[in-house]
Amino acid sequence: MVRDGQVVDSFYSLIQPEPNYYNYWCQRVHGISQDDTDDAPVFSKVWQQLEERIAEVYFSDQELDDIRYQIATLPYVAHNARFDEGCLKAVFKVYQMDYPDYRFYDTLTASRRQFGQSLPNHQLHTVAAACGYDLQNHHHALADAEACAAIALYLL
C-alpha cells in the first residue's frame, strides 16, 4: 500500500481457488499448485483481511463498517488493469460479494504513453527495469505488486 508517495504496507496470501481447480498453463506461469493452497484461506477471508489492513493504513480512526465505502474510493493500480479487474469482478461474483466501482489505474497504459516504442515490450519486468526497479520473482503476486507500485510512483 502506498501513502504519500511511499510504500507503507504490504500483504500477501495464497488463496484456495473455488472450485479447487488448477489450470496447467496458469500453474506454469506462477508455479502455484494445489499442494501450495490446500491450507490457504478462500478469497472472501483474504479480502476481509485486506480490508482490515487498508483500514489500518488509511482510516485507522474509523470503524470498519463505516469505511467500506471509503475503501472503495481508493485508487487501485495494476499492470494491465483490465485483466486484473476482470479477475477481481469474477471472484467477487463467485463469492456473491458486492463489487464496488473500484477506480483502477493502469501502469501498462501509462508505460505505453510514457515510453512508446522506446521499449522492446511493455511487460511488467521490462517497464519496471525502465523505471529503475529490479523485479525479482516475476509472477509472484507480492513481487509483481511491489514492482507495479514502483512503476506507478515513477509514471503516474
Q: Positions of the model-derived regions?
A:
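Acidic two-metal-ion nuclease catalytic site recognized across multiple nuclease folds
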Residues: 128-130, 149-156
